[in-house]
Amino acid sequence: FNDLEFSDPSFNDLMELKNLITKYYSEPADYSSFKYFQKSELFIRQKKLGDALKELEYLVASFPESPITSLAHLRLAMIHFRLENYTNALSHALLLDNTEFADKGIILTGQIYEIQEKNIETSLEQYMKILNDFTYSIYYEPIRYHVRKIQKTES
């Protein structure tokens, strides 16, 4: 580790791992859930999405009170979205309300309604939640532009 440079690709991975450990592995009881999450991350990097889903599903079923569960639901929603399992993606995205990932869940919900369901009105309602309730979100400006684009298209 002493020879690790800032430009080394492993540096970002180590910083991300440090943040995960600090945030989600504060108690010894969190060890198992953290282990399943890290295993799922490895599967995601290997593009073994089915295996990642199994690990994450087990995590959320077995450790519902674990601090990392909301992040697991986000990963589940994103994987299901990528696999075009929109019903499952929506189910997990809706579980992100009142978590630190609520804005991402709302945006994903809006995307599902817009892209899959072709329900522009409901997707706009979701996007407007970001504009009204999540002004601090890094996604605020891109969502604002997207809403404007949709409204121009619908006019």
State the predicted function of each range.
Residues 1-155:
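Acidic, polar-rich low-complexity tracts and alpha-helical solenoid repeat scaffolds
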